Amino acid sequence: MSTFYTVISWLAIFGYWLLIASVTLRILMKRRAVPSAMAWLLIIYILPLVGIIAYLSFGELHLGKRRAERARTMWPSTARWLADLRSCRSIFATHNSEVAAPLFQLCERRQGIAGVKGNQLQLLTSTDDTLNALIRDIELAHTSIEMMFYIWQPGGLADRVAEAMMAAARRGIRCRLMLDSAGSVAFFRSPYPAMMREAGIEVVEALQVNLLRVFLRRMDLRQHRKVVLIDNFIAYTGSMNLVDPRYFKQDAGVGQWIDVMARMEGPVATTMGIYYAFDWEMETGKRILPPEPICNILPFEKESGHTIQVIASGPGFPEELIHQSLLTAVYSARQQLVMTTPYFVPSDDLLHAICTAAQRGVDVSIIVPKKNDSMMVGWASRAFFTEMLAAGVKIYQFEGGLLHTKSVLVDGQLSLVGTVNLDMRSLWLNFEITLVIDDDGFGSDLACVQEDYIARSSLLDPLEWLKRPLWQRVVERLFYFFSPLL
């Protein structure tokens, strides 16, 4: 009997180390950043079973077999649609400013579609203004309303949006709504899904959280886009979720969330529509490509207006494009670079680009919230401050609430606005969308918004920063080590 238990013990030990060795080899064979690989290996060696389960659940980009198969079958029809759209030469920009040209060229070559011109663009900086404008557009819709958000939180003006959308569906407008399962959990537990479906709205719960399928698809892969499309002509996107900040996360201790949204009219709505259709088919299997363009009757064939490129990122989209785009924008800066983000955990390449910009004489400012709703990200962000301050980067800590705006402004001309945070999750994992605008008028509007943020912020003093307590430095470095996983 003792021999039997001895054999079992040795087999268990052998299996234990074989499992660790197998996962280690799997991590090493994957083409991933060295800091990320090292962080995962450390977790596995310190807490083997917990680390292995965590890695198999969250360490690799599993889209899921069903969605991956749909992504493969969707591309031919999408490619044909893009080819048809490219035949409408009058809507595409052929020239860009010097600072914007490299980024527009990158996006066109990687996505297969150029930036579109002739768009009317409005920057909305107030939640009330955004939601009231959205309600008006819904009430005036003629044919279709399509929405996608990470979070829809019932309460306040968000309820008025829901009521307007249900009224539109009842009068015959085709309405679709896609919300992330994890982000909009409060919505899906409310009466609204049933009420909306009864009114005729197609409601889809994207990337459903199912613990039984945890090893088949990453549960932390989220649909983070915020998109509204109306009549294939009006479009919204930006950092704002479908929430009224007076009712949202009031107990988080960070104040009201501060966001911006862009409202657009023109051909950019058509290009955004193809990405909405991609996400819808990925989730439901139903093909809803926008109407094929008929060039001679497009209502927005005109030379005036803003030139906009749309970047869609996430599984199934051009790999690393948003990361490449940010690097291209930073390296294009010659005079000034201003970036706002709620979560700052950059890649080594992006951090190096930002510091290099400051060291070559560019006026570089980063605006982040002083109080963050994510303790881990807040501490990890601080770990990058010393290097940036030493390089000459100005770091502003916003004190007027949780600054949730994601924006980049280069030389007052090139603007990036959308859903992408400057952290690993947005850069490498989640479904995101970003607008690239080549226009000094819009750049001036964005600069005014950023200057208002700076006026409500405190500038971090490099000398005072070096005097912070030792325990804070230790905590920062601890979270910095795990920053590739945040």
Swiss-Prot record:
GO molecular function list: cardiolipin synthase activity
NCBIfam families reported for this sequence: bac_cardiolipin
Chief site of localization: membrane
Gene: clsA
PROSITE patterns: PLD (PS50035)
UniProt source species: Edwardsiella ictaluri (strain 93-146)
Domain PLD phosphodiesterase: 219-246, 399-426
Repeat is among the record's keywords: yes
GO cellular component: plasma membrane
Name of the protein in its database record: Cardiolipin synthase A
PANTHER family: CARDIOLIPIN SYNTHASE, PHOSPHOLIPASE D
Record flagged with keyword Repeat: yes
